[in-house]
Amino acid sequence: MGLISKIARGLVRGADRMAECTSKQGPNSYNKGRGAKKIGYLTASGKFVKVREMVPVFVVPDLTGFKLKPYVSYKAPPGTEDPMTAKKLFMETVGPQIEKDLQEGTFRPEDLEKYGFEPTQEGKLFKLFPRNYIQ
């Protein structure tokens, strides 16, 4: 009966692997844990050895003289500025310079590096728009 009910539950609810095994369903020695990272290892004799390199270290910046508060109230008014779009960013950064060069007649499409265009992303840590560049 147990097998049929589990199959029926799988068909009705879908495959739910997280709810399958709990501490109530396992043996008394079963402890699922909370998903914390291990900071050491168990030896063959069952002794736990703590490894200093595996212990997480939290780096907290010095916030003396920092003006902003760490909490934003839910009663704070919503922002009045429109969300940033690619066109808006372009028009605020490079657009005026290109328009000025077009009016003066000095704009050359093959000299886009002057405006910050990068033809390749060699040496970059993060590749932006990888489909636009030749691999």
UniProtKB/Swiss-Prot annotation:
InterPro entries recorded: Ribosomal_mL41
Principal location: mitochondrion
Transit peptide (first-last residue): 1-13
Entry's Gene Ontology molecular function annotations: structural constituent of ribosome
Keywords: Apoptosis, Cell cycle, Mitochondrion, Ribonucleoprotein, Ribosomal protein, Transit peptide
DNA damage in keyword set: no
Subcellular location: Mitochondrion
Any GO BP: apoptotic process
GO CC terms of this entry: mitochondrial large ribosomal subunit; ribonucleoprotein complex
Pfam entry (one): MRP-L27
Assembly and interaction partners: Component of the mitochondrial ribosome large subunit (39S) which comprises a 16S rRNA and about 50 distinct proteins.
Function in brief: Component of the mitochondrial ribosome large subunit. Also involved in apoptosis and cell cycle.
Family: Belongs to the mitochondrion-specific ribosomal protein mL41 family.
Name by which UniProt lists this protein: Large ribosomal subunit protein mL41A
